[in-house]
UniProtKB/Swiss-Prot annotation:
Belongs to the DEAD box helicase family. DDX48/FAL1 subfamily. ATP binds at A69, Q70, S71, G72, T73, G74, K75, T76. It comes from Botryotinia fuckeliana (strain B05.10). Pfam families: DEAD, Helicase_C. This is ATP-dependent RNA helicase fal1. GO terms for biological process: rRNA processing.
């Protein structure tokens, strides 16, 4: 099913766009392939979101594009529709490549592409670490129109010559702020070096700090910019609160007191380290609370199974590191708890954007010790938002 985009928020979003960007009010106005239109409508979209109505036509024209919009505004479908429009399915070669910072996000993009391209006979493969290399090789040798992957595995497949790059027309960097941070920067350059010189580059993210925009000058030519103004970056419709916790040790008791509230729908609890995730999961289970947990060092099969259980509602409380924060779409999540405030303020919007997806009610609760007050104030200033102390009736806000 498509993201049910929050139209009220969408209508109020302010965009700073390059002068020649027009707005396409309907998908028909974008002159898309008939079978792609069928897939878009079957997926549940009726009309384009604000970012879709601005970015899709520009990307389809072949322009390098920087698109920034909040979580839950249809960013994934923006570049998925664009890729499906420009590829030639008669040519069984990789023509579009998407790089994402996490395996889960890369897999989710693959499923969106397959759903939107349902009537096009499109081949799309998720090329991610932690999976069988032999399966990657088999799929890539068969021929994939679109590859969605994580930078390390994609670079490896290109070096092995199993992922052939000579037909690639478009490179998409999703959650570009995270991708271009130190951890992935070199791998991105590794991949980019192998691409044809005329490859179009599309950069998509909820946050685009200046250093990222600066970096894009190295591999983009005269890009179209579709940027949400900073002041519009508060996730409208989400209620944000803090709970003052005198010391770190007391966070656990506070969380136990909140457990009944957490399970009204589904909740995600964020910690900053995998060690903290494991510790908190064990402590919660010892206290007879049902929780599941996930972090980047778990085997991929285990991560997939945990994600599936959570998506299906079999588990209701998930404890995770930031591996889960970026772009993962689970419709029923109404509550996010920052057990630890994020080290990087850019990640705050990615974390709390997991709750109240697409116009549903959502609540974010931040546990704040005296050492955290400065970080909380910094987040408030950065996003021009106000985070109030949590009221007693928080359960009522979720129902």
């Amino acid at each position: 099913m498509a993201e049910g985009i929050d139209r009220k928020m969408d209508d109020r979003m302010e965009f700073t766009t390059s002068a020649d960007v027009t707005v396409a009010p309907t998908f028909q106005d974008m002159h898309l392939k008939e079978n792609l239109l069928r897939g878009i409508y079957a997926y549940g979209y009726e009309s384009p979101s604000a970012v879709q109505s601005r970015a899709i036509v520009q990307i389809c024209k072949g322009r390098d594009t920087i698109a920034q919009a909040q979580s839950g505004t249809g960013k994934t479908a923006t570049f998925s529709i664009s890729m499906l429009q420009v590829i030639d399915t008669a040519v069984r070669e990789t023509q579009a490549l998407v790089l994402s910072p996490t395996r889960e996000l890369a897999t989710q993009i693959q499923s969106v592409v397959m759903a939107l391209g349902d009537y096009m006979n499109v081949q799309c493969h998720a090329c991610i670490g932690g999976t069988n290399v032999g399966e990657d090789i088999r799929k890539l040798d068969y021929g994939q129109h679109i590859v969605s992957g994580t930078p390390g595995r994609v670079a490896d497949m290109i070096r092995r010559r199993n992922l052939r790059t000579r037909h690639i027309k478009m490179l998409v960097l999703d959650e570009a702020d995270e991708l271009l941070n130190r951890g992935f920067r070199e791998q991105i350059y590794d991949v980019y070096r192998y691409l044809p010189p005329a490859t179009q580059v599309v950069v998509v993210s909820a946050t685009l700090p200046y250093d990222v925009l600066d970096m894009t000058t190295k591999f983009m030519t005269d890009p179209v910019r579709i940027l949400v103004k900073r002041d519009e970056l508060t996730l409208e419709g989400l209620k944000q609160y803090f709970i003052a916790v005198e010391k770190e040790d007391w966070k656990f008791d506070t969380l136990c007191d909140l457990y009944d509230t957490l399970t009204i729908t589904q909740a995600v609890i964020f910690c900053n380290t995998r060690r903290k995730v494991d510790w908190l999961t064990d402590k919660m289970r010892e206290a007879n609370f049902t929780v599941s947990s996930m972090h980047g060092e778990m085997p991929q099969k285990e991560r997939d199974s945990i994600m599936q259980d959570f998506r299906q509602g079999n588990s209701r409380v998930l404890i995770s590191t930031d591996v889960w924060a970026r772009g993962i779409d689970v419709q029923q999540v109404s509550l996010v708890i920052n057990y630890d405030l994020p080290v990087n303020r850019e990640n705050y919007i990615h974390r709390i954007g997991r709750s109240g997806r697409f116009g549903r009610k959502g609540v974010a609760i931040n546990f704040v010790t005296s050492e955290d007050v400065r970080i909380l104030r910094d987040i408030e200033l950065y996003y021009s938002t106000q985070i109030d102390e949590m009221p007693m009736n928080v359960a009522d806000l979720l129902t």
